[in-house]
UniProtKB/Swiss-Prot annotation:
Inhibits papain and ficin (cysteine proteinases) but not trypsin (a serine proteinase). It comes from the Eukaryota. One of its GO terms (molecular function) is cysteine-type endopeptidase inhibitor activity. This is Kininogen. It comes from Gadus morhua. The lineage of its organism: Eukaryota, Metazoa, Chordata, Craniata, Vertebrata.
Length: 123
C-alpha cells in the first residue's frame, strides 16, 4: 500500500482568491486520497485536516421505517388505498380505519418518487 503525502490546504488563500476574481481564471482541484472536513472560519488560517468518516448508509431498496403521521405520506397512501380497494369500499369506511403497525418502504431513487407501501388497516 502506498501512502499519499498529506496536503494541508489553507481555508482562505488570498492570492488564489485574487487570481480567480480578477483574471477570469479557473481553479482546478484534485482529491488525492480522501475527503476532508473542516470548520474553517472565513478568512482564517486553519487547515483542512479532519478525515471524513463515512457512516452506515441505507441501501437503495432496503426497508426503512416510516413515520405514520407524516404529511408527506398522506397522498401516496390515499392513492395506494384507492387503487387496491376491496369490493364495497367506501370513503366513509376508509375514514374510520387506522394503521395498526409501523410500515416499511424501500427508499426511492432520487430520480423517481415511488413508494412500496405495506399496511395493515383495521376499523
Amino acid at each position: 500500500r502506498h501512502e499519499v503525502p498529506q496536503a494541508n490546504l489553507e481555508c482562505d488563500e488570498g492570492a488564489m482568491d485574487l487570481k480567480i476574481s480578477t483574471g477570469n481564471m479557473v481553479a482546478l482541484y484534485q482529491i488525492l486520497s480522501a475527503s476532508k472536513d473542516s470548520d474553517c472560519p472565513a478568512g482564517g488560517a486553519v487547515t483542512w485536516t479532519d478525515q471524513v468518516v463515512a457512516g452506515l448508509r441505507i441501501c437503495m431498496g432496503c426497508p426503512v421505517e416510516l413515520d405514520l403521521e407524516s404529511e408527506e405520506l398522506k397522498v401516496p397512501v390515499a392513492v395506494s388505498i384507492s387503487k387496491r380497494r376491496p369490493p364495497g369500499w367506501s370513503p366513509l369506511r376508509a375514514a374510520v380505519t387506522s394503521f395498526n403497525e409501523k410500515e416499511f418502504s424501500p427508499p426511492a431513487p432520487p430520480s423517481r418518487a415511488e413508494y412500496s407501501l405495506y399496511f395493515d388497516m383495521r376499523k
